[in-house]
UniProtKB/Swiss-Prot annotation:
Binds to both phosphatidylinositol (PI) and phosphatidylinositol 3,5-bisphosphate (PIP2). It is found in: Endosome, Multivesicular body membrane; Prevacuolar compartment membrane. Residues 1-32 are cytoplasmic. It is a single-pass type II membrane protein. Glycans are attached at residues 261, 299, 383, 518. Its EC number is 3.1.1.3. Its main location: membrane. The gene is ATG15. Lipase which is essential for lysis of subvacuolar cytoplasm to vacuole targeted bodies and intravacuolar autophagic bodies. Involved in the lysis of intravacuolar multivesicular body (MVB) vesicles. The intravacuolar membrane disintegration by ATG15 is critical to life span extension. This is Putative lipase ATG15. It comes from Scheffersomyces stipitis (strain ATCC 58785 / CBS 6054 / NBRC 10063 / NRRL Y-11545) (Yeast). One of its GO terms (biological process) is phosphatidylserine catabolic process. It catalyses: a triacylglycerol + H2O = a diacylglycerol + a fatty acid + H(+). GO terms for molecular function: phospholipase activity; triacylglycerol lipase activity.
């Protein structure tokens, strides 16, 4: 070790010889160039003397210049290439800032409410004192020592603004994002932006239960394959900026003293203020879905950040915001059957039938209800696209946790690039919604990336079971399968982390994972995966019989249908189902006869059972135990 360090220091401090100085031409090379030049001159002069060539056509001066300046040109050329590359990279980078906040109401009473808040210079000046105090609180040192890592509600209520931006105001922050120099490819529905088109398609797909044979008869019109801008998933700063937008969606906005007037907000939905019912005008922001819209300087690219599960809000006063609705939608999207984990659980829908049996039709209808988050996120996108036309604007979607799953569902519906952070598995919800997909689309054209880490139990799909933290908090997070690409940081192997709910926080993802690694995680396709494999999903209003019941070892096997066996003359038995019953005399057949009849091999009842109830011996009523 010391010898190597010594050699390094000696090499560093030794003088540079004259032959190593850049641009110097030592005598050996000068002599070599002189000899070559002399031979070339004599040869060309001889050829010109005999009239074979014309020296003027060769440009001898340029040849000499190239020979003498070869070393000097090579180095500046490489630098020029690097400069050209850097200029190309800089052109791919744009700066984004918050322009709008959309709030869409949910629930039976507020689902028609939809409002927009524009972040203008006048709005920032109006609430300057609030933002000054807000920035000071964000700059304070984070103290998570008293947090119970086994309490999901405590973790959701932690301040989750990343340390890398702790001195910046979330409402005025500017974030650099690079687009990939390689375009993404996509195939989209031609009429996806026509009013009512997607709603009618999803409703019809629900009626036919997503049967591809029936849906293919509709002959949906798909656009030709086109190239679109996608985020650079290999750029660390881009990932940090997108994750920060996801974190920004948790920020609580300033509230006026006279909350009823809401002079800063603009109604963009069907809801109209009801002066007689004050409850609809007060506290409306506590129920619903929120999206923060960041726009590039040239207004050509828009990034929508979908808010995740509350409790992870930043300081700013107010209530727990959308916690109640978030929990209901979590349990609807990511559970096998309405969060029916045990008999003491209160389900979020009435689709449960019996043990490990659920009504599939009921589940699909619940997901498409107008007062649920999927319809809300579709309406939110429609209002964003009304301001920024999709024909001239690139729209990307991002989100954390529940927001990431909703972003994935929205992106798959409209063909938008999506980057989701620590989202629970949304493949099950995608199948239940019967989202439209172009036939034969390859994985690389989905443009959906899920960023996660192996120490997050929610992303990995292991936060379930009777003793899990999610279960104790009332969250049925039973899905593990994602769509699109998975970009997973293996912090358990690389950093020795343990699985903990604190690793689900967006602050941890930004400060301790993305920025801690030298390179971004490799994105791979989702391996074959299936959620809720032990559940039986039924449908009672179709002509196709339901799936057969799962075998029950505690129940005697049914009596088989009688069958007769005949010989084909080659000692091969041929069985055929008979419609008549077998007579008792058929058991005693003539030994000389080629037709042989035997009782069915399947027993009729259980003769012996083990101590835990498994049948160990089957037989008929009149059979006697051989051991007796």
């Amino acid at each position: 070790m010391l010898a190597a360090e010594k050699r390094r220091l000696l090499h560093k401090t030794r003088p540079v010889s004259a032959s190593e100085k850049p641009g110097s031409i030592y005598p050996q090379r000068a002599l070599y160039l002189l000899v070559c030049f002399s031979i070339a001159t004599i040869s060309l002069g001889y050829l010109h003397f005999i009239g074979a060539i014309d020296i003027g056509r060769f440009g001898i001066s340029s040849v000499i210049s190239d020979l003498t300046k070869q070393d000097a040109v090579s180095e500046p050329f490489s630098l020029h290439k690097e400069q050209t590359s850097s200029v190309h990279t800089e052109s791919d980078e744009q700066t984004f800032e918050l322009k709008h906040i959309f709030h869409h109401g949910t629930g039976p009473e507020n689902y028609r409410l939809h409002r927009r808040l524009d972040i203008t210079p006048s709005y920032l000046a109006k609430h300057s004192s609030y933002f000054a105090d807000f920035s000071q609180r964000l700059a304070q040192k984070r103290d998570d020592s008293s947090v119970d890592s086994e309490n999901l509600e405590d973790i959701y209520n932690l301040m989750d603004w990343p340390d890398v931006h702790k001195h910046k105001n979330p409402f005025t922050i500017q974030l650099p994002i690079k687009k990939d120099h390689k375009k993404g490819k996509v195939v989209r529905l031609k009429d996806r932006h026509e009013p009512g088109f997607l709603d009618s398609y999803l409703s019809y797909a629900l009626q036919v239960k997503g049967d591809p044979k029936i849906l293919n008869r509709i002959a949906l019109e798909w656009e030709d394959e086109i190239e679109i801008d996608i985020p650079n998933m290999k750029d660390k700063d881009t990932l940090v900026s997108l994750a920060t937008i996801s974190s920004n969606a948790y920020v609580k906005f300033p509230k006026d003293e006279n909350e009823k007037n809401k002079s800063d907000w603009i109604d963009v939905g069907q809801w109209e203020p009801d002066q007689e019912n004050v409850d609809l005008n007060f506290g409306w922001e506590d129920i619903g879905l929120r999206g923060h819209v960041f726009v590039s300087k040239d207004n050509k690219t828009v990034v929508i950040g979908i808010k995740g599960t509350s409790g992870a809000g930043l300081p700013g006063g107010g209530s727990d915001e959308t916690a109640g609705n978030d929990k209901d939608n979590d349990n609807l999207l990511f559970s096998c059957c309405c969060a029916r984990v045990g008999y003491m659980w209160t389900t979020v829908c009435n689709c449960y039938e019996k043990t490990y049996t659920c009504n599939q039709d009921c589940l699909e209808k619940e997901l498409l209800r107008e007062d649920k988050y999927y319809q809300a996120v579709l309406d939110l996108y429609r209002n964003v696209s009304a301001i920024y036309p999709p024909e001239t604007t690139n729209v990307w979607v991002t989100g954390h946790s529940l927001g990431g799953a909703l972003a994935s569902l929205l992106g798959r519906t409209y063909g938008l690039p999506v980057v989701a952070f620590e989202a629970p598995g949304e493949m099950l919800a995608t199948k239940r919604l019967h989202l439209p997909q172009p036939p034969g689309i390859p994985k690389f054209m989905e443009n959906i990336w899920h960023v996660g880490n192996t120490a997050d139990p929610i992303y990995m799909g292991v936060c379930n079971g009777a003793s899990s933290t999610c279960n104790v908090a009332g969250y049925a997070m039973e899905t593990a399968c994602h769509t699109g690409y998975q970009c997973v940081y293996d912090v358990v192997t690389d950093l020795g982390w343990r699985v903990n709910l604190l690793n689900h926080r967006i602050h941890t993802v930004i400060d301790d994972i993305i920025l801690a690694y030298n390179d971004t995680a490799q994105c791979i396709e989702q391996p074959p995966c299936r959620d809720c494999f032990n559940w039986r999903f039924t449908s009672h209003d179709d002509d196709v019989p339901d799936e057969p019941e799962m075998p029950n070892p505690l129940r005697p096997k049914p009596k088989p249908k009688p069958s007769s066996s005949t010989s084909d003359g080659k000692n091969n038995r041929i069985s055929s189902t008979a419609t008549t019953t077998i007579s008792p005399t058929s058991r005693k057949a003539d030994p000389t006869s080629s037709d042989i009849s035997e009782p069915s091999e399947s027993p009729k009842k259980c003769l012996e059972r083990t101590w835990y109830g498994w049948c160990s011996k089957w037989g008929y009523d009149g059979d006697v135990d051989d051991d007796q």
